[in-house]
């Protein structure tokens, strides 16, 4: 019987795990190991993928992949039960390294005072790692509750300790190189060799998190464990025997709450202490010499002796290298530069281990780790029957991931987000800001007139800077409002559910459910959308997602939509904007289907993802994100757009002999724009001023509006040079043509110059074709 045959609320024990290579290793790392007990919670609304409860957390799995896992049915397993027992009275927590308990001062060899203490901040996705980074460094960084929020390494010094450098690494589940994020983290630790590791462990899901911890301990680097979210554990009636956990793991364990700023000072003290004195983990061997793990123990130790010289030469910690060689990690084996004879000996050693253990080598290593983790949890973790957050999540999921309610809920939520952004909150705030900018402009205009400032300077300030930059600034409330709602959806954990719900739909166009998140982020800004695609383990899925993300209309295009819909489609402005967003999505789907059947043939990778509990979005996190986005927008408004505005003003104010013109049609700009204007004549907007605005939009989409504001004299002139039959094709062209230079740069960074050029040319061509189709429909 396979896992795919299991029915809802039925439980099973895994007998064997199929698949091969990195995919199978990923299954094992996620806890799908022989002997593990699981329960089928539900199916996605489309009947695929499924949601499993295993090791106390929810995991998604497609039916095609579930068919590779052999099971046997068992009686019902407890949903979130850990080791249920009454906690003892409060026990003091002296901790490793404190009071000389584990620190021998006679043998200490502290690092020089002037040496920078470098730390790697490592942990699973959704463990609160980025929030911890903000606490430790004071840095402002986006915090979300979807797997893979951190897509780049972020550096900062610990507050109050200038001689430190802490790096926030991507959230990962193991040190196996399945996704690019896991590879980034592993390569950073192995190559850059931080002097200390701060491992963030979610205290409400210790069993899941300790799998990575065990591999980090094998690296023989000074390390502390931050047991995060302890406030939630206590609220649920749970507890952790910290001292016993320290003894079993051999490193300091500090109970903390990054969200409530509890235990942070103690964590910093421990981290700096163990790193300063190079106190490596006391334990790296987790398999018993006897019993079921005896064969694994003998195998790893035999390999350690065999590869010792190679590991030293490659500067890879020997225990870590041996474990990875034992489980068949090809990248580590390659780095060790073993000869054929040594490889044959390793094959014999692992074959003997498989024969004695009754499991293949990868499953045996994973099973050994989970056995030790179970032992740690049995002796140290006191769990309540079910956490409040899990109960709340189950109730919410009945609606948001329900068979008949999930898709309508998604449409309703996104529709509400756009309605509030464009018609209620954002629009009203925009009106207030516009009034303020107009009053300030009139005030400055009066001052410049009364002081007799040179007419050229006067024109530059009022007609150039105030008109151009001011017009873009007025759209800040709409952009911030959209980011506000998107960040709440992401921070709450809803985005992970959207991926779960939409997986089967996206698979029809050749993508994975995980691809929905970069594309949804793309509605805010294409750049982070492209960057967040690094969470996708498949190169094929990643490339397709990056190429499709620009079709999701970014917030920088909002000023264009608002300007033209308010002028030409006032009664139906909201409807037209919603149709534009839908049009971008449908075009992306069409392009995806074409790519799926041509350049990107093949199937998307398995959808194996943890579903985090819903959490109330932290308002501080949301406000920090909004401030970052507002700051970024303002920086662009006063740099790229400011410079573009001045350049546009100069080009449209002077002729080629730098004489001031009375009519802008005689300007340098008119001559330059005239070259490309004929291209847009069939689309209904063959005017040099509009052509110029579209050109500057390549720098930043907000520049389209600011450029037009400089070139035309009020909205009446726009109405004179455009008709509704030309305005709608123009909106479609703006929706689909090349993304801004920052987005192109991020695409180049991820995929190379060839794909970046392809996006520019391809999207301009698609935009022209779609705008032409709309033009033909409008004039029929």
Task: Give the positions of each predicted feature.
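Transmembrane helix-loop junctions at the membrane interface of multipass transporters and ion channels
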Residues: 555-578, 742-751, 771-780
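Juxtamembrane inter-helical linkers in multi-pass membrane proteins
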Residues: 435, 439-443, 496-526, 601-625, ...
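Extended helical scaffolds that flank P-loop GTPase cores
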Residues: 277, 283-453, 660-669
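Conserved G1/Walker A P-loop phosphate-binding module
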Residues: 93-174
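Canonical P-loop GTPase G-domain recognition
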Residues: 233-286
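Conserved C-terminal guanine-recognition region of P-loop GTPase G domains, centered on the G4
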Residues: 161, 186-252
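Hydrophobic core segments of alpha-helical transmembrane domains in multi-pass membrane transport
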Residues: 409-420, 482-487, 565-567, 580-594, ...
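Extended, low-charge hydrophobic alpha-helical regions
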Residues: 363-364, 383, 424-465, 509, ...
């Amino acid at each position: 019987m396979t896992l795919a045959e299991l029915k809802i609320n039925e439980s099973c024990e895994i007998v064997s795990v199929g698949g091969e290579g990195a995919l199978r290793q990923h299954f094992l790392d996620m806890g799908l190991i022989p002997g593990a007990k699981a329960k089928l919670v539900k199916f996605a609304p489309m009947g695929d993928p499924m949601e499993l409860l295993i090791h106390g957390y929810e995991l998604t799995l497609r039916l095609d992949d579930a068919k590779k896992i052999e099971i046997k049915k068992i009686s019902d397993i407890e949903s979130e039960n850990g080791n249920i027992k009454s906690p003892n009275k409060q026990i003091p927590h002296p901790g490793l390294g404190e009071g000389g308990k584990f620190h021998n001062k006679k043998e200490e060899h502290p690092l020089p005072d002037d040496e920078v203490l470098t730390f790697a901040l490592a942990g699973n996705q959704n463990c609160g790692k980025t929030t911890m980074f903000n606490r430790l460094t004071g840095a402002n960084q986006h915090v979300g509750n979807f797997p893979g929020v951190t897509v780049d390494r972020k550096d900062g010094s610990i507050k109050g300790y200038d001689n430190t450098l802490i790096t926030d690494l991507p959230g990962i589940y193991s040190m196996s190189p399945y996704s690019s994020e896991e590879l980034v983290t592993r390569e950073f630790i192995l190559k850059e060799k931080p002097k200390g590791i701060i491992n963030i462990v979610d205290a409400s899901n210790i069993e899941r998190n300790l799998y990575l911890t065990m591999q980090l301990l094998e690296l023989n680097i000074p390390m502390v464990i931050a047991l995060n979210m302890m406030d939630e554990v206590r609220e649920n009636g749970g507890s952790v025997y910290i001292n016993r956990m320290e003894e079993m793991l051999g490193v300091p364990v500090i109970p903390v709450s990054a969200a409530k700023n509890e235990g942070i000072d103690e964590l910093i003290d421990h981290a700096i202490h163990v790193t300063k004195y190079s106190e490596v983990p006391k334990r790296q061997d987790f398999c018993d010499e006897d019993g079921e793990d005896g064969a694994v123990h003998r195998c790893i130790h035999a390999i350690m002796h065999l590869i010792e010289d190679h590991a030293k030469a490659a500067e890879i910690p020997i225990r870590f290298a041996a474990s990875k060689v034992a489980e068949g990690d090809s990248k580590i084996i390659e780095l060790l530069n073993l000869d054929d004879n040594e490889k044959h000996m390793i094959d014999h050693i692992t074959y003997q281990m498989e024969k004695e253990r009754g499991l293949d080598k990868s499953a045996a290593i994973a099973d050994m780790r989970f056995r030790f983790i179970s032992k740690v949890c049995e002796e140290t973790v006191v769990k309540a029957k079910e956490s409040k957050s899990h109960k709340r999540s189950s109730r919410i999921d009945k609606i948001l991931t329900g068979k008949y309610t999930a898709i309508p809920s998604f449409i309703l939520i996104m529709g509400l987000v756009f309605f509030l952004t464009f018609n209620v909150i954002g629009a009203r705030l925009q009106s207030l800001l516009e009034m303020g900018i107009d009053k300030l402009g009139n005030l400055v205009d009066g001052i410049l007139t009364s002081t007799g400032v040179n007419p050229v300077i006067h024109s530059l300030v009022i007609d150039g800077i105030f008109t151009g930059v001011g017009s873009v600034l007025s759209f800040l409330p709409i952009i911030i409002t959209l980011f506000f709602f998107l960040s709440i959806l992401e921070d709450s954990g809803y985005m992970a559910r959207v991926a779960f719900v939409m997986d089967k739909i996206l698979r029809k166009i050749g993508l994975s459910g995980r691809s929905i998140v970069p594309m949804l982020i793309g509605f805010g800004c294409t750049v982070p959308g492209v960057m967040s695609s690094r969470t996708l383990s498949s190169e094929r899925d990643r490339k397709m997602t990056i190429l499709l993300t620009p079709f999701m209309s970014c917030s920088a295009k909002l000023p264009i939509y608002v300007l033209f819909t308010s002028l030409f489609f006032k009664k139906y402005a909201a409807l037209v904007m919603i149709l534009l967003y839908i049009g971008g999505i449908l075009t992306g789907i069409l392009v995806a289907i074409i790519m799926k059947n041509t350049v990107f043939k093949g199937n998307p990778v398995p959808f194996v993802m943890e579903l985090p509990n819903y959490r109330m979005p932290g308002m501080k996190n949301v406000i920090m994100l909004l401030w970052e986005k507002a700051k970024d927008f303002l920086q662009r408004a006063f740099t790229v757009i400011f410079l573009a505005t001045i350049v546009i003003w100069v080009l449209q104010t002077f002729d080629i002999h730098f004489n001031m013109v009375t009519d802008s049609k005689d300007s340098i700009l008119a001559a330059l724009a005239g070259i490309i204007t004929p291209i847009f004549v069939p689309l209904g907007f063959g005017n040099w001023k509009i052509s110029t605005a579209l050109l500057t939009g390549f720098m930043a989409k907000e520049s389209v509006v600011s450029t037009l504001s400089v070139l035309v004299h009020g909205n009446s002139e726009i109405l004179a040079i455009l008709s509704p039959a030309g305005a709608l094709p123009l909106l479609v062209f703006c929706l689909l043509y090349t993304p801004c230079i920052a987005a192109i740069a991020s695409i180049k960074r991820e995929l190379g110059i060839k794909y970046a050029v392809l996006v520019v040319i391809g999207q301009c061509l698609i935009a022209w074709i779609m705008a032409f189709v709309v033009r033909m429909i409008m004039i029929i």
